[in-house]
Amino acid sequence: MEHVFKIVNADDLDSIDLFNNIDNLKDITGESMAGYMTYGVWILFGRKPVGVWECLQVGQSSNIGSEIISDVKCLSGEIKTKEGIEYINQFGQKVPNYTYNVYLSPREQIYERVGKEYNKFVFVCICCGEIYKDEKKAIEKYAAWKFRALFWRNGGSFKEAKENVQEPEDIENIKPTIKNSIDNMVKKYNEHIK
């Protein structure tokens, strides 16, 4: 399946109809990601060949550019299980007749499957820069909670299905401008999926 990967800053969404025209957004390339090689938070929206846009994931990182590039590789199916890797011990010696396999991480497995079902993806950068270093985890939680991001996990998955999951803690100190930006995106998103 051919994929489309785009990126946009949340600040630019006032002038862009995110869910109806992604052609005007930047393609994800090494060059377009250069300004994102820092702390930040992003939201991933995806669309199947037939259907509406869905909020798939929210993430935060000390280098969101590198993380998004890695996610694109996973979604594209570029990261595969590696089989038959020669075992090299701590002394730099190959151990004859010993090989091992490197399997995909749970994140890579999920993204690989998502990439088989969805063909269009937009990463929205909520915030980017060193000033968000201490706040990024709280912003991620707030955005994921508000969007109910389909594949988001706060550290680990639940072992059993639950109802009425409570609002995450530590979100009260998020700057009002960031909260308002997220709330406005959620409003537009909810109007889109109705």
What would you call each of these model-derived segments?
Residues 1-56, 60-194:
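Boundary/linker segments flanking structured domains
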